[in-house]
């Protein structure tokens, strides 16, 4: 899964897809518990415009256009998007309400109330394992609206907080249990592209847990990968996905000897909730 990073303006969507991405990531900012914009703000990755944005509802409607067969904007290879939900400043009550609002927003503006909406898979990424109530409420809303089937298209990522230190993987697992999530788990690790590359110790730990007999992780992705050398290192560690500002870099590496026989871009027929067994 090759994810275009920080794709927050609708005009950026075809640019990243044409550069080779089969998925995108967008940053969803809130006013209180209301998802309002796809917007990152400053600071952000080096070399990027941090202030590109769109209204949340319009952004989802545009994603629907690009992922609905028969639509003039349809891209067959666009199969997944990650919503990086900026819930860090919300209290517990707001987190629950935010889960409700995001569920209703996706249902109306992306899934078209279950009537021939967009077909892409969705990963909901939350910055704090304490925000598991967001996921519980999200799921409850879709069930109450009669669209529990759409949960087949939804995965979850709980990846923080980052300060004072990242939570242990056991703590992350417990949060998923509290959220009522068994499967459909994506877990990420990474650094902004202007930070020095570390030893990827946590990434290796996540991959090891994914591959263990009692692993709770479906897929592992790494961000922000913009260098050829970092791409090769991440692939060697065994990631399932890479998030990048420059999709063509990853495409180039995937076509190199040593990688083209081991890796390929995911297609719609590949199950993003199924752990790949070597």
UniProtKB/Swiss-Prot annotation:
| Catalytic activity from the UniProt record | an N-(acyl)-sphingosylphosphocholine = an N-(acyl)-sphingosyl-1,3-cyclic phosphate + choline; an N-(acyl)-sphingosylphosphoethanolamine = an N-(acyl)-sphingosyl-1,3-cyclic phosphate + ethanolamine; a 1-acyl-sn-glycero-3-phosphocholine = a 1-acyl-sn-glycero-2,3-cyclic phosphate + choline; a 1-acyl-sn-glycero-3-phosphoethanolamine = a 1-acyl-sn-glycero-2,3-cyclic phosphate + ethanolamine
Q: A single GO BP annotation from the record?
A: killing of cells of another organism
Is Cell membrane given among the entry's keywords? no
Cofactor(s) required, per the database record: Mg(2+)
How is the cofactor bound, as the UniProt entry phrases it? Binds 1 Mg(2+) ion per subunit.
Binding sites annotated in the UniProt record for Mg(2+): 25, 27, 84
Q: Where in the cell is it found?
A: Secreted
E.C. numbers = 4.6.1.-
| Gene3D superfamilies reported in the protein's UniProt record | Phosphatidylinositol (PI) phosphodiesterase
Cystine connections: 44-50
InterPro entries linked to this entry: PLC-like_Pdiesterase_TIM-brl
Q: In which tissues is it expressed?
A: Expressed by the venom gland.
Q: Which UniProt keywords apply?
A: Cytolysis, Dermonecrotic toxin, Disulfide bond, Hemolysis, Lipid degradation, Lipid metabolism, Lyase, Magnesium, Metal-binding, Secreted, Toxin
The UniProt entry lists the main location of this chain as secreted
Residues of the active site are: 5, 40 (nucleophile)
**GO molecular-function term, one example from the UniProt record:** metal ion binding
Q: Name one GO cellular component term.
A: extracellular region
UniProt lists the family membership as follows: Belongs to the arthropod phospholipase D family. Class I subfamily.
Function text:
Dermonecrotic toxins cleave the phosphodiester linkage between the phosphate and headgroup of certain phospholipids (sphingolipid and lysolipid substrates), forming an alcohol (often choline) and a cyclic phosphate. This toxin acts on sphingomyelin (SM). It may also act on ceramide phosphoethanolamine (CPE), lysophosphatidylcholine (LPC) and lysophosphatidylethanolamine (LPE), but not on lysophosphatidylserine (LPS), and lysophosphatidylglycerol (LPG). It acts by transphosphatidylation, releasing exclusively cyclic phosphate products as second products.
Under what name is this protein listed? Dermonecrotic toxin LlSicTox-alphaIII3ii
Native organism is Loxosceles laeta
Question: What is the phylogenetic placement of the source species in the record?
Answer: Eukaryota, Metazoa, Ecdysozoa, Arthropoda, Chelicerata
């Amino acid at each position: 899964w090759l994810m275009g990073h920080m794709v927050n303006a609708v005009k950026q969507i075809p640019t990243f897809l044409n550069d080779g991405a089969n998925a995108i990531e967008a940053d969803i900012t809130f006013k209180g518990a209301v998802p309002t914009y796809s917007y990152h703000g400053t600071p952000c990755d080096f070399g990027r415009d941090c202030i590109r944005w769109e209204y949340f509802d319009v952004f989802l409607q545009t994603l629907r256009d690009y992922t609905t067969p028969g639509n003039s904007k349809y891209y067959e290879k666009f199969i997944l998007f990650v919503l990086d939900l900026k819930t860090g400043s919300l209290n517990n009550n707001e987190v629950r309400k935010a889960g409700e609002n995001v569920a209703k927003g996706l249902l109306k503006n992306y899934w078209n109330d279950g009537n021939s909406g967009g077909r892409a898979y969705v990963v909901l990424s939350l910055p704090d394992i304490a925000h598991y109530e967001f996921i519980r409420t999200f799921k409850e809303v879709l069930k109450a609206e009669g669209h529990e089937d759409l949960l087949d298209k939804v995965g979850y990522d709980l990846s923080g907080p980052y300060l004072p230190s990242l939570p242990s993987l056991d703590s992350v697992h417990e949060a998923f249990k509290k959220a009522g999530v068994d499967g459909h788990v994506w877990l990420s690790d990474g650094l902004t592209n202007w930070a020095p590359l570390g030893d990827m110790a946590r990434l290796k730990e996540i991959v090891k847990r994914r591959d263990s007999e009692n692993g709770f992780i479906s897929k592992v992705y790494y961000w922000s990968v913009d260098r050829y050398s970092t791409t090769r290192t991440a692939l060697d560690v065994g990631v399932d996905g890479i998030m990048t500002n420059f999709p063509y870099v990853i495409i180039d590496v995937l076509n190199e000897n040593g990688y083209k026989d081991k890796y390929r871009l995911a297609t719609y027929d590949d199950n993003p909730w199924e752990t790949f067994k070597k």
